[in-house]
Amino acid sequence: MSLFNWPLLVTAILLGMGLGIQAPINAWIGKRLGSPYWGAGFSISISLVVILLFVFIMVRTIPSAETIWNAPWWVWLGGIFGAMFVAGAIVLGPRMGMALFFTCVVFGQVSISLLIDRFGWFEIQIRELSVSRILGVLLVIAVILLIQKEEFGLSNSLE
């Protein structure tokens, strides 16, 4: 992908902003419902309704049960990790602060993505590991340290 494929880049950024908004909203609803897990359940239920609408409007076909059951074992991990992320964001986001939480999430995503790209896991096209990609991960670590530097008594608050 070209660095200048602006529509894709902007769409990805907007999706990331949506995730940034989703976590505190889910935390709010979880608090009102009495448990972060109720908040996660509420959020995932809404997600299910929305994605089913997309499927029925845009795809209009239903895969066979055989296709689903014959899929590799790891396809089930997507839903499991999705639920864990939503619940984890509700619990950890407010405690850590949303900026630190999501920077740690980005670090986790980029780190595992480098391995997925390098080894072609989950039938992804192999992409070589490079110095610039490793430096990118190190920069995310630097951002984590900068965001939480107040923990080390190095505050430079704008307030």
Model-derived features: positions:
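C-terminal transmembrane-helix exit sites in multi-pass transporters
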Residues: 111-129
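Hydrophobic core positions of alpha-helical segments in small-molecule transporters
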Residues: 42, 104-105, 132-135
